[in-house]
Structure formats: structure tokens, C-alpha cells
Amino acid sequence: MAVESGVISTLIPQDPPEQELILVKVEDNFSWDEKFKQNGSTQSCQELFRQQFRKFCYQETPGPREALSRLQELCYQWLMPELHTKEQILELLVLEQFLSILPEELQIWVQQHNPESGEEAVTLLEDLEREFDDPGQQVPASPQGPAVPWKDLTCLRASQESTDIHLQPLKTQLKSWKPCLSPKSDCENSETATKEGISEEKSQGLPQEPSFRGISEHESNLVWKQGSATGEKLRSPSQGGSFSQVIFTNKSLGKRDLYDEAERCLILTTDSIMCQKVPPEERPYRCDVCGHSFKQHSSLTQHQRIHTGEKPYKCNQCGKAFSLRSYLIIHQRIHSGEKAYECSECGKAFNQSSALIRHRKIHTGEKACKCNECGKAFSQSSYLIIHQRIHTGEKPYECNECGKTFSQSSKLIRHQRIHTGERPYECNECGKAFRQSSELITHQRIHSGEKPYECSECGKAFSLSSNLIRHQRIHSGEEPYQCNECGKTFKRSSALVQHQRIHSGDEAYICNECGKAFRHRSVLMRHQRVHTIK
């Protein structure tokens, strides 16, 4: 049988103690490449690569070298070292581990907000804590099911003891979280299981003393399949070679049974095994797209919206729809004007915690995202991606009307207003409308008299930065505009254009009365006085 990526390596118990355990491979028809192509989101694709890397198991490859090469490829696709610095890669790993120790409901909620760092994830949780300070507050569930009271949520770790145990208040819970994967305790359990067979709690229905053949006592001893016959010997690290993840199962189990049991124990590395015992009865709801499983149907429903694009929560003000109720709450702050997140440095307020986190980088000067081509640094990876299109020439956003392409979606949106005639930015003073918000801001200075751009030499102020730049050339003597014909230079581009008409003979200003043409508009205006006098 062929092996496809996406199956979690697991140790599966046997009911009859006398039956021996054999090493098998699992077939899963899930194609990661197809799912990658179907999903246009870079962040979603990166998450798929992360899952594929973490769940990779030994396939029908010629040997360990090819398996290692495949793991390296998946790791590269996930961490993207060509874009991320060492610090960012470390941040991704820490963020992944932090999310893994969260209770399931919180884990889903945080993941759907796509935090870029551990700090951002913590801020999201702290914001959620404030929202649920009210004891009667409820956690949003799926539209098909009722909202779940916050204190009735079940912790991932606590669920192994009793699914009826209620959560502590969030503030207490945040202080008492423990990793679901404990290297010390779990590896000790793994070592004991290797020495004595698999010895698990009777409550989980595991056999007391099944036997393994040829397995080392060390918890880090993973094995490769040798041949395909029943009763094959298992090789230990002391026999040489490289090692991968393995699946032990009773030969009577079918492929579907094995797939359903595939989350008993996850073996993460060969040097430090960390087993996460998640009985399938506690996670019965599985996503058909990416293989994630959940304890509650409502959690699966929320997760599936990532793949389906369903957005059941609609804003009554503007009609915009969202996949999560929490997104709708954040969006509604645009209409209400609420800005709950304030910068302690400058007092500027924001309606999203993530926006505040990005803003703080202005004060700290943090620019961790560096361009490999020119060395320019940015505070956000999204800015770096946009910047790199300067070097690659990529313009992925195309206008359906004229075919013109742009490197940024915002530029395409502004361009399309030329075709639609849309002018969404209107002046409250005179009613004049503009295509861009920057044009409205500039226009409003006519009414307010604001002149924010001041010359450091003479103190003269201007309403536009371009006017200040032109003015400063008086002090510096700079004349950057040069005529290609005679070499004469000018302070303003308009002066150069007028001068070039001498060489070209172009007379752009024509009198409507007599048809006489002039090079300069001022000369035409003087000429027109002749007709008005008559």
C-alpha cells in the first residue's frame, strides 16, 4: 500500500495479548498538493505545510535519505527562510508550541485570528479575557448550535479525566495552563511502556502487557520497516541507519480503523519523544479537507469555514459578512467609532489589538523583515512581500476593464474608480468628492487653513509637502530639471516644459478669437486683452 502524507504516527493497542504487533504503513488518498492549489491564501498554505511537516510519516521511499529530503523540503516550505529571519523562525516555532498547549476552543479561536507572533496571540487572549469578565458572557458557537457558556468549556487536558469538568475563570486558567505535551512525564511513560509493553490506564481500555520484538528500551528508539512479511524484525538505532516515525497495529485492523485510531500517540522527534495521548472518542469530529479532528461538532463547523469560505455573521450596518462572531464584533467598531486599544507611548487608539501591536513597532523601531536584494527592512512581513515585487516585477492585480496590472491591491482599487467614476471621499464643508482619501485630506486644508509643512530655513509654511520641496530649492539652489537639448537647468518641471517648447516650436496656447498661438499661457492672457478692449 502506498503512503500519503497527513497520517499521524501512532501506537495502537491490541486486544488479544498473545497476538504480536507488526509494523505497517497507512494509505490515505488525501493530496496535499491539490489542497495547496485550491487554497489561495498564503497563510493558509503555510499552515498546510506546517501540518504536513508535523504529520509526515515514513512512505515507500528508497530509503531514509529520501525521507529526510522530503522533511527538509516541507520544513523549508513552512518556515520560508528566504523571507524570514532567524528571529522570525524562532518566533514561529514558539508560537506553534504556545498554541498547542491552549485549550481546544481557545486554540481554534486564536488560530482563526492568524496571529503572526506569540506576543500577538497573548494580546488576543488578554482581549478575550476582558470581553468575558462578565460571568454571563458566552463564547460564540456555530450558527447551528447554541452559544457555549464560557465556564462550561472543557480544557484539553481536563477532558482526559472527565468531560464534565468546567473551566476555571479565564484569568485563573491563564495562570494555570500546563503543556499538553510534557517531555519529562510523557517520555517516562513512553520508556515504561517500552520496557513493560504498553501499560496504560484501565479506563482507556488498553492491554496490560502486549509484547514488542526487537525494540530498544530507550524512549528515542524509532524503527524503519524491514520487508513486508508478517512477524518481521524491527531494527533498533544500535543497528545503524536513520529512523522515522512508525505505526504499530494489530494486523486484524483495517485501513479505515487504523486511520480512525491515528491520534493515539504522536511521535514528534527521534531524540525526544513527546506522546500526546488523544483517544479518538474524545475527538470524533474530523475535517475531511485537512484531517484536523475536534471534540465538539461546533468546533469542526467553525474550522471548516476556513476551507468553505462561509461567512454567516453579517453586519446590519453595511452588510459585510464574517466567518466568526468575534470578527463581526471587531468590524462593528468601525461604525461605532470605538477604539479600545490605546498606545501608551503616544496615546493613539485603535479598534483592533493587532493594529496596536503593529503601531508599537514605530516607537521601538523594530524592523525584523529584511529584503535579501537591497537590504531594506520592514516592520511587517506583508510590507516585505509587497516591496519584493519591485525586484521581481510581479504585478498580480489586473484591471478587468483595461488590463492594466498593479503590484498592490489598493492601487488596483484606486485605479478602478477611473472606470466607475466613484468618488467615495466627500468634503463636509463644500461637498466636493474625491477618488482618494489623501486628496480629500489635502483639499480640507483649504477650508481649515492648515499648513503643516514648514521651511526650516525661513519658517514659511505650506499645505502640501511638494510645495515645500519646491520652495526649499530657493535656499539650496538646486535645479534638478535639465533640458536635453541645451543643458539648461530649472527648479521646477513646469519651467522645463515651457522651455522645451522653444526647441520644439510647440505653441500650446491658442487664442479663441483670432487663432494666434503662444508658448506661454501668460502671454496668451496678455494678448486676449487686445480683444476685450475692442
UniProtKB/Swiss-Prot annotation:
Short name of any one Pfam family annotated for the protein: zf-C2H2
Domain called SCAN box: residue spans: 50-132
Positions with biased composition (Basic and acidic residues): 193-203
GO process terms (BP): negative regulation of DNA-templated transcription; regulation of transcription by RNA polymerase II
Keyword match Phosphoprotein: yes
Organ and tissue specificity: Expressed strongly in testis, moderately in skeletal muscle, pancreas and prostate, and weakly in heart, placenta, liver, kidney, spleen, thymus and small intestine.
Annotated stretches, region: Disordered: 180-217
Top-rank taxon: Eukaryota
Keywords assigned by UniProt, alphabetized: Cytoplasm, DNA-binding, Isopeptide bond, Metal-binding, Nucleus, Phosphoprotein, Repeat, Repressor, Transcription, Transcription regulation, Ubl conjugation, Zinc, Zinc-finger
Sites of the Glycyl lysine isopeptide (Lys-Gly) (interchain with G-Cter in SUMO2) crosslink: K55, K171, K202, K251
Entry keyword Transport: no
Zinc finger (C2H2-type): 285-307, 313-335, 341-363, 369-391, 397-419, 425-447, 453-475, 481-503, 509-531
Database matches in InterPro entries: SCAN_dom, SCAN_sf, Znf_C2H2-type, Znf_C2H2_sf, Znf_C2H2_type
GO cellular component, as recorded: cytoplasm; cytosol; microtubule cytoskeleton; nucleolus; nucleus; plasma membrane
Subunit annotation: Isoforms 1 and 3 can both homo- and hetero-associate. Homo-association of isoform 1 is dependent on the presence of the SCAN domain.
Cross-referenced PANTHER family: C2H2-TYPE DOMAIN-CONTAINING PROTEIN, ZNF44 PROTEIN
Protein name stated in the entry: Zinc finger protein 397
